Design a protein with these regions (language model features):
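Short, acidic loop-to-helix structural element flanking the phosphoryl-transfer center
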Residues: 75-103, 109, 113, 139
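Conserved small/polar residues in nucleotide/adenosyl-binding loops
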Residues: 183-187
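Short secondary-structure boundary segments
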Residues: 106, 180-182
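Substrate-recognition "cap/lid" segment bordering the active-site pocket of phosphatases
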Residues: 79-80, 109-157, 163-172
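N-terminal helical cap/lid subdomain that shapes the substrate entry/recognition surface
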Residues: 2-9, 13-88
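Acidic di-acidic motifs
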Residues: 16, 160-161
Length: 187
């Protein structure tokens, strides 16, 4: 029996990835001296939180770039003002069935809080687990949730959107449901 459903944030709760890429590029570009930062350069740092991503992209002066990122990210969030249709209703239905709801994201605490506030979801989750600057820590966060709630892996499901989400789930023995919620044009 499922007792805990955990969600990823970027690409699962909302279409925030394009905005994240633009905000990161805008924040780090003034601090990169050798080359322009490409979208690919940024994508290669995914799995780390924004502090780790920016440190890797900028090196020296990363603190200033990180401060800039938070300002830019909050300003740009108008590009993604709400979660995917049906997400908040799904969470409410699960809660009515007494299922625990968690958020496990690679984002750092501050950018996660900005997004949840923008989506008016800052009180939706029983627990929020964020990323770290050194490595993808989702498997570790899953283990912590299982321990916190004294659950077995088969009592938890994670809803994510990347191959790395599947890998992290398999590492811990929990099921991963893959979300493909991106809006596409009719053409």
């Amino acid at each position: 029996m499922i007792k805990l459903v955990a969600f990823d944030l970027d690409g699962t709760i909302g279409d925030t990835i394009p905005m994240c890429l633009k905000a990161l590029k805008k924040a780090v570009t003034p601090y990169v001296t050798l080359n322009d930062v490409s979208e690919n350069d940024i994508l290669e740092t995914f799995g780390l939180n924004e502090k780790g991503m920016i440190k890797k992209l900028v090196g020296y002066n990363w603190e200033n770039a990180l401060d800039d990122f938070y300002v830019i990210y909050e300003q740009m969030h108008i590009m993604c003002p709400r979660p995917f249709d049906g997400i908040t209703e799904l969470i409410e239905k699960l809660k009515k069935k007494s299922i625990l709801i968690a958020l496990v994201t690679g984002k750092g605490e501050k950018s996660c809080a900005i997004t949840l506030r923008q989506f008016n979801m800052d009180t939706c989750f029983d627990k929020v687990k964020t990323g770290n600057p050194f490595k993808n820590n989702k498997a570790e966060n899953f283990r912590e949730l299982l321990a916190d709630y004294k659950l077995q892996p088969d009592e938890m499901i994670y809803i994510g959107d990347t191959v790395s989400d599947i890998v992290s789930c398999r590492e811990v023995g929990i099921r991963c449901l893959s979300a493909c919620l991106l809006y596409t044009s009719p053409s």
